[in-house]
Structures are given as C-alpha cells and as structure tokens.
Regions:
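Non-heme Fe(II)/2-oxoglutarate
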Residues: 2-4, 9-10, 16, 242, ...
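Histidine-centered catalytic micro-motifs
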Residues: 160-167, 247-248, 252
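Double-stranded beta-helix
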Residues: 185-248
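Short edge-strand/loop segments of extracellular domains
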Residues: 151, 192-199, 267-271
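A short secondary-structure junction signal
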Residues: 144, 156-161, 173-174, 185-193, ...
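Non-heme Fe(II)-dependent double-stranded beta-helix
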Residues: 3-6, 10, 15-161
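Short, conserved beta-strand element in jelly-roll/cupin
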Residues: 168-184, 266-270
Length: 308
C-alpha cells in the first residue's frame, strides 16, 4: 500500500505509467539516466565533488575491478565481528518494515547512532575505500543504510530476485555486507559484468516493470543474442560485494536453509569524507524519505547550511 503523504501521488503516478511500458525499450535506459544525471543534477553534483577531492587516487584506479568489471567481492570483517554486530542489532528488536513503499523489505531498525557507526566503520574498510575512491574519483557519503532479513523460501522473495538494474544515477554504488554464512542460509547474489550487462542493455530490457523481469540467465542471453556468464556469490559471514547497481545486472539468490542477514549501504559522491557527511546528517531514512533527491544540486546548499 502506498502511504498517504505528500509523496504518495507522485509514486502512484509513476507506478501507473509503468503498467503501460513495453517489455523491451532501448530508449528507456537513455531516459532513466537522463532523468537522474541531467534533470535531477547528479552529474553536476559528481563534478562538484570531484573538484573538491583533497587526496590522491589509489594506484591503478582506472583499472580497479569496480571500474572495469562493475563489481568486486572482498572480505570486510571477520565472521566473529559479523556475528557480534548482528547480535547487537537484533537484541530486543522485532523484524520490521524498512522502506516506506515496500512491504517486502524487512529487517532491523538502525536508530542507534553508536551502533550505526560501528557497522559503517567495520564495513567501509581501507579496501572498500580504495575501490569507492577509484570509482567516484571523489569522496563519498552513505546515502542510506539498511539491515535486512530475508526468510528462506522456495520462491523468489521479491522482484529483486530476478535479473534487474536499480534505477538511479549512473554514479552510485551499493555495498552488500553479509552478516551470516552461506552455509546457514544458501542465499547470495548473482552478477553480470559490465560487458554482459551492456549487451543486455542494448535490447531495452533494463528498468522494465518488476513483473517483466526474468529469473533465467538463459532467457536473458536469448534476449541479448549472446552468451552470458554470471558470477554467483556464495558469501561467508563478513564478506561483501561492492557494485554499480544502475549498470550491472544482478539477481538475488533466494535463501533456502535459513534467514539471510545483509547490511546494505548506498554510496553517493561527496565533497567531504563519509564520516563527516554522516555526522552532518546527509543520509536519508528509507522509512520516511523519497529514495532519490529531486535536485541533487541542492545538496551543496544543504551541506553549507549544516556547516555554517
């Protein structure tokens, strides 16, 4: 159900329009990126952030996996640390809805600033920082964060468990940190690299309505007219994937043995380091806020007002 607040009518209109979209529409990809990068000002925001970078890029930044491949896997914390953080978050909490316009995303509320800092400090380690810096060529901020719980099922938990890209600016990243082990839940995520995703993108498959997505890699390859090879990530507790969600096709692997717990961070370019941006309150709350800014260029004024 769509919440009856000031954002509700716009959400409803967008959902109704998508019912009448064609299944395959190459123009749709162009229109989506034009909306976010040009009309909503995310390209201008990125340029501003890059101009203010005050540290050197890592060696080999142009050839970092996140840049060339579109995703990279890396351990970010020990299994013991992952278990401790999950226990700290889950104690005295019931599973709750995490996103205002989705009943399918459930998990734990992250309302304790101290606990949020522990989670982010453990996740955004030097290896992740080097990849993010190579991709953005600027500092970055945490746009939003969730700790989700996906129950085991024989069927896909949501349309996120079909092949898709996430609508949004081209220059954003997601970091998925798995807090329990693949052996416990049997879940994960599959990825196509940038080359394979681009081949599919040319067909107009990207950004179609959720019910028009496919779970089948073979069907996706038939649409693209080329062989596709997916990477199936079977994470250990404490492992993470950093990827370009707007450009890399991905599909959740439904857990079958037990619940899967994932900390998800959405990263955007920033003119200041992420800890400073977090302290200034530059993040949004998915429970109450729209997912994306109407005009990202206004972020500069918001930042100035919090520091002035």
């Amino acid at each position: 159900m769509i919440p009856l607040n000031r954002h509700g009518p716009g959400i409803l209109l967008r959902k109704l329009k998508r019912w009448f979209e064609p299944d395959l529409d190459p123009q749709r990809v162009i229109d989506v990126f034009d909306e976010f990068d040009r009309a909503r000002g995310y390209a201008d925001w990125q340029a501003l952030c890059r101009a203010r970078l005050g540290r050197a890029l890592p060696d080999g930044a142009d050839h970092a996996p996140i840049v060339e491949q579109g995703y990279t896997t890396l351990p970010v914390m020990s299994a013991g640390t992952a278990a401790e953080l999950l226990q700290a978050v889950g104690q005295d909490q019931e599973v709750a809805r995490l996103k205002r316009d989705s009943a399918k995303l459930e998990g734990y509320q992250l309302d304790d600033p101290g606990l949020v800092s522990r989670l982010l400090d453990a996740s955004l380690n030097p290896a992740v920082d080097a990849q993010a810096l190579s991709f953005f060529r600027s500092e970055y901020l945490v746009h939003w964060y969730t700790l989700s719980r996906t129950a085991p099922s024989r069927e896909p938990a949501s349309v996120s468990f079909r092949w898709h890209c996430d609508k949004g600016p081209q220059s954003h990243l997601k970091l998925l940190v798995y807090l329990n082990d693949y052996d416990e839940h049997g879940g994960g995520t599959s990825y196509l690299d940038l080359a394979g995703s681009t081949a599919v993108s040319r067909t107009g498959y990207m950004f179609a309505r959720g019910q028009r997505r496919t779970e089948s890699l073979e069907e996706l390859a038939a649409i693209a007219g080329t062989e596709l090879k997916a990477y199936d990530h079977h994470p250990r507790a404490g492992d993470a994937v950093l990827f370009q969600p707007a450009r890399v096709l991905h599909s959740g692997i439904t857990p079958t043995r037990g619940p899967r717990y994932v900390l998800t961070l959405c990263l955007l370019p920033s003119p200041v380091p992420w800890r400073e941006a977090l302290a200034l309150g530059m993040q949004i709350d998915l429970r109450t806020d729209p997912l994306w800014h109407e005009d990202a260029r206004l972020l500069e004024k918001r930042l100035a007002s919090t520091t002035g």
